[in-house]
């Protein structure tokens, strides 16, 4: 059964549609990432589920219980929805110790039950030695663990995380993502993670929901989102993608780099074919491309290459070869499956 079930939810601010006709399910023990750029509506959708905002249309169910039915004026307050919440700034109580912060959500249980649960969460989040410390005495990673422990204390079926890694040092984020995911999976707690960081979404979630301008563009596994995007926006927003011109003719897509089998849904006519950076390789005898730009990234060099048509692709070179701007490189493009879209405007292609 779905722990979260959102049906046709809409939210407007005056004439601006923040969330448009949203349908979304989160399964038991599933981690779902809401991924989108700034202003896409992802945080608004999370707040609607949490009960911090009221939708203008739609239904929301949590653990099978209806908490929102706009048409029939059903509204369950945030504190009665049974969800945990981890805020971007952690929102810890500065005057309470670590143990007191965790204990805050357990006021309806006995003293003994509170002690047992706090001790359990301190062990789980590796905070046993920090019981009596205050938030200002903790590192960012430790504060985040306290916030997660507090959210998990009442044993919610689902935890909502609003960009929880933003305030951490970049070097610490991957470790904290792994720790948070490990804790959630150990407890079997479902979660919705709001993020604009594709690495977070792809690396941490069981499924990813890409949102843009208040509309869900695609929902699927990280692999599906990356390798089989259904819109040009998803293709360009998730991962690094270039697009080259092609033409669908019968069962083929014809491009200047080769002829490929056409996906069955594509109508005849001009298309843009997605080329991921890792699909481009240097190979003797391949089509000649001209180096327009090179960027040294430490373990690799990223080259922007211009094809004869003027379209550009990128090549990630990990070999110690050095090509100057203007050098011609023979390349091949390996496409296990073709992802192509009808010719679109630059606004559709942009991130």
Residue ranges of predicted features:
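ABC ATPase nucleotide-binding domain
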Residues: 25, 61, 330-332
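Pre-Walker A (P-loop) beta-loop-beta motif of ABC nucleotide-binding domains
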Residues: 22-33
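ABC ATPase nucleotide-binding domains
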Residues: 82-84, 88, 92-233
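Non-catalytic connector elements of ABC transporters
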Residues: 241, 252-351
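Helix-to-loop junction immediately C-terminal to a conserved catalytic motif
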Residues: 50
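The feature captures the beta-strand-to-loop junction immediately N-terminal to the Walker
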Residues: 35-37
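Conserved ABC transporter NBD signature motif
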Residues: 58-70
């Amino acid at each position: 059964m779905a722990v979260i079930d959102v049906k046709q939810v809409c939210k407007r601010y005056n004439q601006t549609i923040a969330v448009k006709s949203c349908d979304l399910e989160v399964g038991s023990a599933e981690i779902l990432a809401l991924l989108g750029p700034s202003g896409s509506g992802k945080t608004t959708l999370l707040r609607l589920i949490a009960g911090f905002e009221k939708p203008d249309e739609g239904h929301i169910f949590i653990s099978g219980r209806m908490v929102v039915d706009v048409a029939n004026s059903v509204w369950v307050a945030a504190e009665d929805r049974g969800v945990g919440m981890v805020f971007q700034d952690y929102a810890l109580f500065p005057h309470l110790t670590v143990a007191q912060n965790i204990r805050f959500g357990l006021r309806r249980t006995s003293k003994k039950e509170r002690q047992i649960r706090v001790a359990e969460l301190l062990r789980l989040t590796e905070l046993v030695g920090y019981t009596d410390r205050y938030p200002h005495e903790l590192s960012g990673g430790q504060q985040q663990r306290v916030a997660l422990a507090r959210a998990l204390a009442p044993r919610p079926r689902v935890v909502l995380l609003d960009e929880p890694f933003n305030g951490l040092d970049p070097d610490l984020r991957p470790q904290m993502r792994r720790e948070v995911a490990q804790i959630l999976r150990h407890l079997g707690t479902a979660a919705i993670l709001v993020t604009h960081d594709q690495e977070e979404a792809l690396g941490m979630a069981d499924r990813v929901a890409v949102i843009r301008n208040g509309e869900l563009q695609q929902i699927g596994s990280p692999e599906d989102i990356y390798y089989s995007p259904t819109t040009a926006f998803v293709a360009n927003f998730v991962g690094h993608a270039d697009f080259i011109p092609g033409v669908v003719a019968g069962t083929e897509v014809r491009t200047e780099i080769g002829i490929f089998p056409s996906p069955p849904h594509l109508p005849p006519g001009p298309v843009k074919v997605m080329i991921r950076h890792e699909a481009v390789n240097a190979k003797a005898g391949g089509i000649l491309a001209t180096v327009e730009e090179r960027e040294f990234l430490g373990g690799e060099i990223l080259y922007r290459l211009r094809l004869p048509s003027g379209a550009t692709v990128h090549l990630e070179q990990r070999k110690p070869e050095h090509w100057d701007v203007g050098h011609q490189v023979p390349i091949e493009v390996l496409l296990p499956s073709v992802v192509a879209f009808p010719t679109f405007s630059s606004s559709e292609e942009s991130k």
